[in-house]
């Protein structure tokens, strides 16, 4: 099973692009990482502060460093006071990312992950990918421009239905 890859898509991400799945497949095949997952740039303060948007920090090689529902990285000395802060410029000039709930695992890595008990940070944040990080597994962050349509709260259902209607999906 050395060349078998398993993809998991979280149920709250109903409109993931097939192209995004293809890019994850390519990324995991050509890497030494255990798992690959997509990330997308954050361009506004609302998403950055919203706990339903899972934020991620990564190394320059794309290795995930941490995932959180809190705003990470923390911006020291900046209150995001709208009166004296150019929010749009800030997010354009700085790389802040949010996570999309799709994973491409190497078979052996998923097998290992499935045997691990819930970790401390996973319990605190309710984010299973933290179990991998806490146990020394390597997650590759694959940047995308595909904006996912997550359904995290009841008000997201009508937004998603409207997008699906525009796409011709019933």
What are these regions (language model features)?
Residues 14-15, 148:
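A short, conserved beta-strand element in the Rossmann-like catalytic core
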Residues 81-170:
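Conserved alpha/beta core of the MobA/IspD/sugar-nucleotide pyrophosphorylase nucleotidyltransferase superfamily
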Residues 1-3, 31-33, 137:
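Short, high-confidence coil segments that cap the C-terminus of an alpha-helix
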Residues 9-11, 39, 106, 153:
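A secondary-structure boundary/capping signal
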Residues 1-11:
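Short beta-strand-to-loop acidic/aromatic patch adjacent to the donor-nucleotide binding site
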Residues 16-116:
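Conserved core of the sugar-phosphate nucleotidyltransferase
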